[in-house]
A protein has these predicted regions:
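ADP-ribose/adenylate-binding Rossmann-like module
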Residues: 119-146, 328-372
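A short, aliphatic-rich alpha-helical micro-motif
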Residues: 115, 322-324
Length: 527
């Protein structure tokens, strides 16, 4: 089966509705419409420009839930900041150019005459539209504002892409939920017990969320301004998919960034990545461009930032050279094993993020102060190895599968020949020659009918927002070290934002962080 830009969105719909199959043609044919509007004052601020572009970037990728997006903004509006991928001086022209380069199935067009027929409206700044399902957003520095009944604030000149992007994600998620609910009720009115519609909650009234201290409706006092130049010093991002890519995109939106950044990811951009990779355009997926190269280009305007792009898995990279001191490591990788390997390499700080369907977390690891990645991702001895289960179904040996997964290798004709008989027996789609085993498994785990794989197709907003928050943690680590995450935050995005962070303690019997030898080695390494 050919991979499409909406492949993962369709799989996500199945999981949200707890359905083995959906009528993909009907989902594409049934309209799902969103109007994005902005007033003159909001669009003149840098924060308003950040929020508008992130909203366009995210929502236009969500076909077939969204089929049409209208954009109504003042025509003379011009950029006062650099927003990655949105090039040119005039904002409307830059948006239309971005959509042309994205080339996805959701139709995005300028709207001059506003009618009441939209399923939902996202207003960048205050709105006086009398249209049902209108969500308004604004930001002030680190603080995002989202309202269902009219904003009590506006975009301020306290420029900060983190707060603006958080507002766009939370507000964008609200309009997405409204359109998703409308279409799913129309196309699949009967709900299973595990249908996500039982748990959907919408913002009522007004809500603020601080990307600085993770408070909901808290005091706006804790909201420091960003310096013009931020020294990232030595930063490593392992995994530049949706989360790590959103971190890099957010950092690329700063006024100036200097230091050294290492990007690690073995994969190329694929069509199915397009629903959640905010840095990717069609040219990247068509050319199978390495993810690290696409992300590196985002950061090319920073003259004092040295970016190293490593198209390797973390295991391959660390096996090929000695790992010295890693100052700050951002972990947005897919497997527990890789996270444990990262922890054994003993970075000074790890910023870890992950998502399961609609629920994400961000975590900071400080040895001796918080749970380490071995505490939180310890292997369960009772679990049957996934490779054994896959071997029984695919016809490949467990050792072959382990190697294919660990090296991110491509399948050859000989693999496919041996999988053919199993495909006929179990009814799964055979991979293509040259396709990565991990990519094929991700796309067809449902056909394998393996409850043990528990593969999930996450909600795009739930992959991007943690990446934005991790970028905020990088900024705080360098500029506001007394205010870093202590040490865990989670948010289920089909619900309302959770209020505040949770401080967790290390596991008392952890073989790594509770070891005196580990603490002595860490102290010797970092003084």
């Amino acid at each position: 089966m050919q991979e499409r830009a909406d492949s993962r969105t369709l799989e996500m719909i199945k999981q949200l509705l707890s359905k083995a199959r959906i009528n993909t043609k009907r989902w594409a044919e049934e309209l799902g419409t969103v109007l994005i509007v902005a007033d003159q004052k909001s669009i003149e601020t840098a924060n308003g420009q950040f929020a508008l572009c992130m909203a366009i970037n995210m929502l236009s990728r969500l076909h077939p839930v969204l089929t049409h997006i209208g954009v109504s903004i003042p025509d003379p509006a011009v950029f006062s900041v650099n927003v990655p991928l949105f090039t040119g001086n005039k904002i409307l022209d830059a948006i239309l150019d971005f959509i042309n380069k994205l080339k996805l199935d959701c139709k995005v067009e300028r709207v001059d005459l506003i009618h009441r027929g939209w399923d939902a409206v996202l207003s960048i700044g205050p709105s006086n539209l009398a249209i049902e399902n209108t969500i308004s957003i604004a930001s002030d520095g680190w603080i995002a504002y989202v309202a269902a009944d009219g904003l009590a604030t506006v975009f301020t000149k306290n420029t900060n892409p983190i707060g603006a992007y958080a507002a766009a994600c939370i507000g964008g998620m609200e309009v997405f939920k409204k359109v998703f609910l409308k279409k799913s009720n129309l196309l699949l009115p009967e709900k299973t017990p595990f249908d996500i519609r039982w748990r959907l909650k919408f913002i009522k009234g007004r809500l603020s969320f601080s990307a600085f201290d993770y408070r909901v409706n808290g005091s706006p006092a804790n909201n420091p301004s960003l310096p013009l130049t931020i020294n990232g010093r030595d930063l490593t991002i392992a995994g530049v998919g949706a989360g790590g890519g959103a971190t890099a995109y957010s950092l690329a939106s700063l006024h100036d960034l200097e230091g050294r950044m290492t990007l690690i990811d073995p994969d190329e951009v694929k069509p199915s990545n397009m629903n959640r990779y905010v840095y990717a355009l069609q040219r990247d997926s068509v050319s199978n461009r390495p993810k690290v190269e696409a992300v590196k280009e985002l950061l090319s305007d920073f003259k004092k930032l040295d970016v190293q792009a490593c198209q390797n898995s973390y295991q391959e990279l660390t096996a090929s050279r000695e790992i010295g001191n890693i100052d700050v490591l951002i972990s947005t990788v897919d497997t527990k094993e890789t996270r444990r390997n990262m922890q054994w390499d003993m970075p000074r700080v790890i910023l870890d993020a992950a998502v399961v369907l609609t629920d994400f977390y961000v975590r900071r690891v400080d040895i001796g102060k918080s749970p380490c990645l071995i505490c939180t991702h310890s292997p369960k001895e009772v679990e049957r190895p996934l490779e054994e289960i896959l071997s029984e179904v695919t016809g490949l040996s467990a050792s072959e599968i382990a190697k294919l997964r660990s090296t991110n290798a491509c399948l050859v004709q000989e693999h496919i020949n041996r999988m053919t008989k199993s495909s006929e027996k179990y009814g799964f789609t055979l991979p293509s020659v040259g396709e990565r085993f991990s990519d094929w498994l991700m796309m067809h785990c449902g056909e394998l009918v393996l409850s043990a794989t528990q593969e999930r197709f996450p909600l795009p907003f739930a992959t991007v927002l943690p990446g934005i928050l991790i970028a905020g943690e990088v900024i705080k680590e360098r500029c506001f070290p007394k205010d870093v995450l202590q040490n865990y935050y989670s948010y289920d995005m089909i619900n309302l934002p959770a209020n505040g962070m949770t401080e967790m303690k290390p596991v008392s019997d952890c073989i790594f962080c509770s070891s005196l030898a580990t603490k002595e080695r860490f102290a010797k390494k970092y003084g």
